[in-house]
């Protein structure tokens, strides 16, 4: 906790003092790119990804220790009947991750990515946001700090994902609280909500934002009132990665909502981040546009679990490999343009 005694103060200070990109590393990467055996710009966005890696790691583009971090949390708002699945599925899926049986496990194997799963007090759901704040300031700050530990073991590319029954309701509430509009614009099917369940989901988002409306000018208050433990932990992980020069790939609708909290607190807070994919959740593209980002992939996915970010990590690894492994015109004896 900060010297002032207010739990969020340390995070506010970090958000005011974010490190910027490494200009020298970026210039060096651009210079090397101009010497590689290809026409300028021929690798399209792969080139920009390589430059992004250089700028935010401070060294030549490379991905040697990529990590997918999944944060799992449960939500009191599920008592409002906003999802067809019981909250017990969150813990069951955490066990599935540990056993290697989920989609994210297979994608991590395919792309040689590390995987860590963080169980965030699943037996103690957050407060029902239609009736009370999801978390106290102290609990929210502590969960952010816990999320910051995701990179403690060392990584040079962090993929952020989540698992939590009810958390697309949470994400919709955050987006409505931050950006306005209507609940209908931000609420989607999530794990398959339709009919009366979807109506209850929309109603819950409306009620939650109305209840907390006098406190939504502060992004950290949006997070603690409308969010959840996985939201706070993902925000902490993204922030820690920035401080430690670790580029980040953000996954789907829920992870994007966590990122939006940081962006609202500091417009430069996500400069070290890419959006891995746009999901089929209806509000996701709108949320990405609010962040000023362009997703790497659009595969019609809506699973969460870091799956889209992990797939995008394969592209980032390829971008780094091309930049570092291609021959220059001089090395290959190939004539450059005149």
UniProtKB/Swiss-Prot annotation:
Active site residues of this protein: 305
Pathway(s) this gene product operates in, as recorded in its UniProt entry: Nucleoside biosynthesis; alpha-ribazole biosynthesis; alpha-ribazole from 5,6-dimethylbenzimidazole: step 1/2
UniProt keyword annotation of Transferase present: yes
Keyword set, alphabetical order: Cobalamin biosynthesis, Glycosyltransferase, Transferase
EC number: 2.4.2.21
GO BP annotation list: cobalamin biosynthetic process
Pfam families membership: DBI_PRT
Superkingdom as given in the UniProt entry: Bacteria
GO molecular function: nicotinate-nucleotide-dimethylbenzimidazole phosphoribosyltransferase activity
Similarity comment: family membership: Belongs to the CobT family.
Role played: Catalyzes the synthesis of alpha-ribazole-5'-phosphate from nicotinate mononucleotide (NAMN) and 5,6-dimethylbenzimidazole (DMB).
Protein name listed in UniProt: Nicotinate-nucleotide--dimethylbenzimidazole phosphoribosyltransferase
């Amino acid at each position: 906790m900060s010297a002032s005694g207010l739990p969020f103060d340390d995070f506010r200070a970090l958000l005011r003092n974010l490190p910027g990109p490494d200009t020298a590393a970026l210039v060096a990467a651009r210079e090397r790119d101009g010497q590689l055996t290809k026409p300028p710009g021929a690798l399209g966005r792969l080139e920009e990804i390589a430059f992004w890696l250089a700028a935010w790691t401070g060294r030549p583009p490379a991905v040697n220790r990529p990590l997918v971090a999944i944060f799992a949390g449960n939500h009191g708002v599920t008592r409002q009947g906003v999802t067809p699945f019981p909250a017990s599925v969150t813990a069951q899926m955490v066990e599935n991750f540990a056993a290697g049986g989920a989609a994210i496990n297979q994608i991590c194997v395919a792309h040689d990515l590390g995987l860590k799963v963080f169980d965030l007090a699943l037996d103690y759901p957050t407060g029902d946001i239609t009736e009370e704040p999801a978390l106290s300031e102290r609990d929210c700050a502590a969960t952010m700090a816990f999320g910051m530990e995701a990179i403690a073991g060392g990584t040079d590319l962090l993929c952020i994902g989540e698992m939590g029954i009810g958390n697309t309701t949470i994400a919709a509430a955050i987006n409505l609280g931050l950006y306005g509009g209507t609940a209908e614009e931000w609420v989607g099917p999530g794990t398959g909500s339709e009919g009366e369940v979807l109506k209850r989901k929309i109603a819950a988002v409306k009620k939650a934002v109305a209840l907390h409306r006098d406190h939504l000018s502060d992004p950290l208050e949006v997070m603690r009132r409308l969010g959840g433990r996985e939201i706070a932990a993902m925000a902490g992980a993204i922030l820690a990665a920035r401080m430690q020069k670790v580029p980040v790939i953000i996954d789907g609708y829920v992870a994007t909502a966590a990122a939006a909290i940081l962006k609202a607190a500091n417009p430069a807070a996500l400069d070290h981040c890419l959006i891995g994919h746009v999901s089929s959740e209806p509000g996701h593209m709108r949320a990405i546009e609010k962040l000023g980002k362009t997703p790497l992939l659009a595969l019609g996915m809506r699973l969460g679990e870091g799956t889209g970010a992990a797939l995008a990590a394969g592209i980032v690894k390829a971008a780094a490999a091309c930049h570092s492994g291609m021959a220059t015109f001089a090395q290959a004896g190939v004539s450059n343009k005149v």
